Design a protein with these regions (language model features):
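Feature marking well-ordered beta-strand scaffolds used for ligand recognition
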Residues: 1-232
Length: 232
């Protein structure tokens, strides 16, 4: 990821989106190190077949001056553009990656900061937004002008972070800073979110409680779920 044209930039690969039909990969540059957490401001375009670095570019800066900072998760949208979530709670839309000059545009900014892992389902982008303790759904049918269509607060004080989609059940899994995992229903026709209250454990509260459990390896204690994927 080193690029002599960007000697002072943080060029630490964080995530990537693959576009095989264009023979391209788009990667983000951000850091898990707290010291450099808010230093990343670039993305890179690679040739998939050779893994040759084709372009390093700065993300679009909007009037709020922070929505572009720390690009993290990259996702391919229904329009073929790459949507990048930032720690500054922005959504950057990357286009023209098969040309000499790819383009970046900050198309949306969520409230707060430290937004986490997004999920795209059809033409909806689901974003974890810690400051509102839940999720916000954008309709990205018009990628240049996303529109909020729904939001769901999961729990007072819940610092939402990870989202993942299961097409078989039509459910999103959500984790955060609590010892609890939630399942959320997504209406794919409207983008509306609702809690799956049928998914609960012995305490009767929505979600699965990881606190004070006896685990298969013999350890008893509290686990905090983080990254979650569904089996196929």
């Amino acid at each position: 990821s080193d690029d002599p044209a960007f000697p002072g930039a943080l060029l630490t690969p964080y995530s990537l989106a693959v576009l095989p039909e264009l023979d391209r990969v788009v990667s983000t540059n951000s850091s898990m190190d707290e010291v450099n957490a808010f230093s990343g401001v670039t993305y890179q375009v690679w040739q998939l077949s050779t893994l040759k670095l084709l372009k390093t570019a700065y993300l679009d800066v909007d009037k709020n001056l922070y929505g572009h900072i720390s690009p993290e998760e990259a996702r391919v949208g229904p329009d073929g553009a790459v949507y990048i979530q930032t720690l500054g709670c922005g959504i950057e839309r990357i286009t023209d990656v098969d040309r000499d000059q790819p383009r970046s545009k900050l198309v949306y900014t969520f409230p707060g900061s430290f937004c986490g892992v997004p999920t795209i389902v059809g033409h909806y982008l689901v974003q974890s937004v810690p400051v509102m303790h839940g999720l916000i759904v954008l309709d990205i049918s018009n990628g240049n002008k996303p529109v909020e269509v729904s939001r769901l607060k999961l729990n007072d004080g819940f610092f939402s972070h990870w989202t993942g989609w299961d097409a078989k059940t039509g459910r999103l899994v959500v984790t955060g800073d609590h010892a609890r995992l939630y399942l959320v229903k997504l209406d794919q026709s409207t983008g509306a979110l609702t809690m799956d209250n049928a998914f609960h454990d012995a305490n009767g509260k929505p979600g699965f409680d990881f606190a004070n459990r006896k685990w298969p390896q013999g350890w008893t204690g509290t686990g905090q779920p983080h990254g979650v994927v569904f089996s196929r």
